[in-house]
Amino acid sequence: MEKMQRTVTCGGLNKDFAGKTVVLNGWIHRKRDHGGITFLNLRDRYGLTQVVVDDDASEDLKALAVSLKQEFCIAVEGLVRPRPDSMINKEMATGEIEVKALKIEVLSKSEVLPFQIDEKTNANEDLRLKYRYLDLRSKAMQEHIMLRSKFTFAVREFLTSKDFLEIETPTFIKSTPEGARDYLVPSRLYPGKFYALPQSPQIYKQILMVSGFDKYFQIARCYRDEDARGDRQPEFTQIDLEMSFASREDVLSLTEGMMQYAFKKSINVDLPKTFERISYDEAIDIYGTDKPDLRFEMKMQDAAFMAEIGNFAVFKDAVSLGGAVKALVVKGQAEAYSRKKIEELEAAAKIYKAKGLAWIKVTEGGAKLEGGVSKFFEGKEAEICSKLGAEKGDLILFVADKYKIACTALGAVRSKLGKDLGLLNPAEFKFAWIVDFPLFEWNEEENKWDPAHHMFSAPQEKYIATMEENPEPVKGDLYDLVLNGYEVASGSIRIHNPELQKRIFKIVGFDESEAEKKFGFLTEAFKYGAPPHGGIAPGLDRIVMIMAGETSIKEVIAFPKNSFAVSPMDDSPSEVDQKQLDELHLVIKE
């Protein structure tokens, strides 16, 4: 029998279709029987339509309707009719009409579901991932995947309009150190040799600049073999772009324009024309992190003066040893925060190596301080409140330690307060640029300098002559884009001088022969008229996650791995047979 092909989607009907015969294809979302009448909510990715099998239908059709189960895939031919006023469902886009079924064809049956398919599935993560094809039918997941598609299309549209070329770089590449472990692919044709899957297209996009393709982009799949933790995925997607003859300002301005265009196109949100710029040092000093959430104010302050005016040994010791006292004024929360709740904040600070969290409550308009360490500052109430901007009803929190620990620990407390006090509006999008990052960071374990981002970022001009003598203060031409407390893009102006690149390799511990072996093809390319260039790589998964109001990138990836880098649906990674191992000249060690 010829299948009934749909003539309209389940979200496409309205009163204008009344009196017309249509064919719908979809899944039975809900079914209910009521006095000889069967109601079916038929679903596809466009929406829901109510289908009715009336009591005047043929006996065969009524019997078929009774036998239908949830998630059966069916075709329905029926007559569109307006619902009675009392039956109009304003919660449904098609709620003014219903379809009187004339024919029903079962295209495919469904077994009993492992979980209910609702607007958003509440099953545990591994069950959702095992039956991902069912999970993806939920309204929330359908909306997330469609949002991802719309956003990606808008990015392509914008960059193409700016004369960027979409160019694919290789997926099988040379293994080079980029921070995380490479995923390795053994070569059957060349025993003992391996390709790597790219952690990013970094080197190849720089070579494209040398090749004369001055504006490149790619929706790039990237692979990193990292330890299972947090919200990491072994494979992820970035909007990779690079520009020749470009300054930092050119890259930042282009990225702002791209985000403005794509946000407007995909979720109809207007972003500001320019994003706030914050130096790395300032971000650490006032927010305690290089990815601050700017949806709420609450800036940290320097409170070293309290070591001088009070008798609290912890503050005095920290300052005398060259450390810092950092303060956070939490407006109007003195009464709300009991000792127990403050201890919860202290636990957040201790994760970042703070020894404790000191506190004071302001009462009587700043004339009195109570609780915590207030007894060490008697008679200094007015000075403390004046310098810190504290008022009656405020809670003041302190961390005293080495400067970096004091900042990051109190920054973690700030982040927790933002969540606890409901200050994080998921419908608000606060972008900012973090600029002037250190080019190098000290690796305590290996007793050497590491690149803070990667080895191909250019130092700022004023540091080039002396960077070998003292790498610590060297700032790079680096920039991160942050959004709502997440780093969503990282980029830099690149090195295009082969001699400067070799100097950077040497500082981070590559001798000349090792650098030549790993990166010789790049420095060789730089010898043939390499243009100045720079770029950035926004993380597609994370940006769409934030747009969707989610907290895990798994919610915006069609087929993610779980937190242990395993796919419960297809049971990957999996063992392979001995023949495949033999062909690849591989032996599994016990």
Swiss-Prot record:
GO terms assigned for molecular function: aspartate-tRNA ligase activity; aspartate-tRNA(Asn) ligase activity; ATP binding; nucleic acid binding
Reactions accelerated catalytically: tRNA(Asx) + L-aspartate + ATP = L-aspartyl-tRNA(Asx) + AMP + diphosphate
Keyword Zinc: no
Coiled coil: none
InterPro entries: Aa-tRNA-synt_II, aa-tRNA-synth_II, aa-tRNA-synth_II/BPL/LPL, Asp-tRNA-ligase_1, Asp-tRNA-ligase_1_N, Asp/Asn-tRNA-synth_IIb, AspRS_core, GAD-like_sf
Sites where the protein binds L-aspartate: E178, R224, H453, R494
Main location: cytoplasm
Function: Aspartyl-tRNA synthetase with relaxed tRNA specificity since it is able to aspartylate not only its cognate tRNA(Asp) but also tRNA(Asn). Reaction proceeds in two steps: L-aspartate is first activated by ATP to form Asp-AMP and then transferred to the acceptor end of tRNA(Asp/Asn).
GO terms (BP aspect): aspartyl-tRNA aminoacylation
A GO cellular-component term linked to this record: cytoplasm
Name under which the protein is recorded: Aspartate--tRNA(Asp/Asn) ligase
Amino acids binding ATP: R224, D225, E226, Q233, E487, G539, L540, D541, R542
Oligomer and partners: Homodimer.
Site (Important for tRNA non-discrimination): H34
UniProt key word Nucleotide-binding: yes
Keywords: Aminoacyl-tRNA synthetase, ATP-binding, Cytoplasm, Ligase, Nucleotide-binding, Protein biosynthesis
EC number: 6.1.1.23
The organism's place on the tree of life at top rank: Bacteria
Aspartate: annotated span: 202-205
